[in-house]
A protein has these predicted regions:
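Domain-level signal for soluble alpha/beta catalytic cores
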Residues: 3-386
Length: 386
């Protein structure tokens, strides 16, 4: 497959529906679901019983988002072991825990290492990655629903020039297969009626961090070339789908309330200009993300979702603080092109961040209530569940 860049400056990419309160994707996994996953993986729980327990967790995630008033909801990624789990579970060819182990840290300097996947054989899509997630949510709620997917750029981190060489001597062939798989998934979701697809790409921010840039080089991947290639891959994946809102989520790592990168968006603002996404969901909960000035590079027909509410810390932000920061951002991006969300998911990995279920609910309610006070009641078409 040949990847070509897209000149987006002269084209309009307005989103089909404006959502003022959003959720990035993952929600905390209840203890009973974690236990069930352990028993299922140990062969102590049947597939049918595990599916029943997963369904219960998704039903609870849907109910949580509905009662807190979030405009558009997800299944909480309850069926995934990590935000990228849908790729690893649905596509053959990965060693689940044999890849580049990136250290996550917090403000105290405490670290943990997350073993990640690595491609070791030719990729083969065994089943759709997100179709079940979307169709289940659509059947259970009258609210607008979205689906979250890994980006090709994130999957680039699962290539190792030594461990992957037997299947893919060069990274380009691997990434071409990844793009084809992800593009097929987008087409399937579109066919099923999904109107909002979010692409998760925290590895863009990894390209800001000197240590992580060196990690890419050591694995045969030029980080500077990867930035331009990644925007091309993103455009190839989402293609041209009128009536579909595509969002891009950028953060700096999210694992058990720890992160792996810092730095403002300045060095990667070409992502705003060169991709087709109508909606950018950006982490902005603390000083690690820098200021709002890079938002000047966002084209005038795009929406910026300000991730001002921390999903890493239990302390609840004040509405006054959020409104002040929204006002600051509106000096750069007009208010009618802004929205509000948590800075990331609450459980990008199954362990989840260091918050309680009550903390999570309070944060989601804060997002929804603040959005309504700033932008008014949403004008969103609801539907009867299928």
């Amino acid at each position: 497959m040949v990847l070509t860049s897209c000149e987006t400056e002269s084209m309009e990419f307005k989103e089909a529906q404006v959502y003022r309160s959003d959720v990035v994707g993952s929600l905390l996994r209840p203890a009973y679901l974690k236990d069930a996953r352990d028993r299922h993986e140990a062969g102590q729980l049947s597939e049918a019983e595990f599916k029943r327990i997963e369904d219960r967790a998704v039903d609870e995630a849907i109910a949580l988002q509905e009662r807190t008033g979030i405009d558009v909801i997800t299944d909480g990624e309850e069926r995934r072991y990590a935000f990228y789990g849908h790729l690893i579970d649905a596509v053959e060819g990965f060693d689940k825990f044999g890849g580049w182990a990136i250290p996550f840290r917090n403000e105290k300097g405490e670290e943990l290492v997350l073993p990640r996947p690595v491609v070791v054989s030719k990729l083969r899509r065994k089943r759709p990655m997100c179709a079940e997630e979307f169709t289940y949510v659509r059947a259970r709620t009258h609210h607008p629903a979205k689906t979250t997917m890994i980006s090709a750029q994130q999957a680039a981190a699962y290539y190792d020039s030594k461990k992957s060489a037997g299947a893919y001597p060069k990274i380009d062939a691997y990434l071409a297969d990844i793009v084809d798989i992800l593009r097929d998934e987008v087409q399937e979701l579109t066919r099923l009626g999904c109107t909002y697809i979010q692409i998760d790409s925290p590895q863009y921010a990894a390209l800001l961090d000197p240590q992580l840039r060196e990690g890419y080089r050591q694995r045969g991947n030029d980080p500077d070339r990867l930035l331009d290639l990644s925007t091309e891959m993103d455009n190839a994946v989402i293609g041209d789908c009128p009536g579909i809102t595509f969002g891009l989520h950028l953060c700096r790592g999210n694992n058990q309330s720890k992160f792996y990168a810092s730095g403002d968006y300045g060095p990667i603002t070409r992502v705003f200009r060169q991709t087709r996404f109508q909606r950018f969901l950006l982490e902005y909960d603390d000083e690690r993300s820098g200021g709002f000035d890079p938002l000047r590079q966002v084209p005038e027909d795009r929406t910026v979702v300000l991730g001002l509410v921390s999903s890493k810390k239990a302390a609840l932000e004040s509405k006054a603080e959020l409104k002040q920061r929204i006002e600051q951002a509106s000096a750069i991006i007009p208010l009618d092109r802004l929205a509000l969300s948590p800075q990331c998911g609450f459980a990008s990995t199954i362990e989840g961040n260091l918050l309680t279920l009550a903390d999570q609910e309070a944060k989601l309610r804060l997002v929804a209530e603040t959005a309504r006070e700033v932008w008014g009641e949403p004008v969103i078409a609801t539907r009867v569940p299928a």
